[in-house]
UniProtKB/Swiss-Prot annotation:
Its main location: secreted. Disulfide bonds join C40-C46. It comes from Odorrana hosii (Hose's rock frog). Has antibacterial activity against the Gram-positive bacterium S.aureus ATCC 25923 (MIC=12 uM) and the Gram-negative bacterium E.coli ATCC 25726 (MIC=12 uM). This is Esculentin-1HSa. One of its GO terms (cellular component) is extracellular region. Expressed by the skin glands.
């Protein structure tokens, strides 16, 4: 009924929000690692 439709939407929205946040965290880690690697390559400290 109406409740199950609403519940499904709410769960889907939460899941999408969670996935986006996880993606952001992982993305930031990848970017940071990339910057670290680029920095050590420039300095020749790898």
């Amino acid at each position: 009924g109406i409740f199950s439709k609403f519940g499904g939407k709410a769960i889907k929205n939460l899941f999408i929000k969670g996935a986006k946040n996880i993606g952001k965290e992982v993305g930031m880690d990848v970017i940071r690692t990339g910057i670290d690697v680029a920095g050590c390559k420039i300095k020749g400290e790898c």
